[in-house]
Amino acid sequence: QGGWPRNPIPP
């Protein structure tokens, strides 16, 4: 769970 550029991990 993520969201570029806040979280560099894949959704």
UniProtKB/Swiss-Prot annotation:
Which keywords does this chain's UniProt record carry? Hypotensive agent, Metalloenzyme inhibitor, Metalloprotease inhibitor, Protease inhibitor, Pyrrolidone carboxylic acid, Secreted, Toxin
Protein's UniProt keywords contain NADP: no
Q: Where in the cell is it found?
A: Secreted
Biological processes, Gene Ontology terms: regulation of blood pressure
Family per record: Belongs to the bradykinin-potentiating peptide family.
Mark the transmembrane ranges: none
GO: which molecular function terms? peptidase inhibitor activity; toxin activity
Q: Which residues carry this modification: Pyrrolidone carboxylic acid?
A: 1
The record's function comment reads: This peptide both inhibits the activity of the angiotensin-converting enzyme (ACE) and enhances the action of bradykinin by inhibiting the peptidases that inactivate it. It acts as an indirect hypotensive agent.
Q: In which tissues is it expressed?
A: Expressed by the venom gland.
The answer to whether UniProt assigns keyword Endoplasmic reticulum to this entry is no
Q: What is its main location?
A: secreted
What is this protein called in UniProt?
Bradykinin-potentiating peptide 11b
| GO annotations of cellular component type | extracellular region
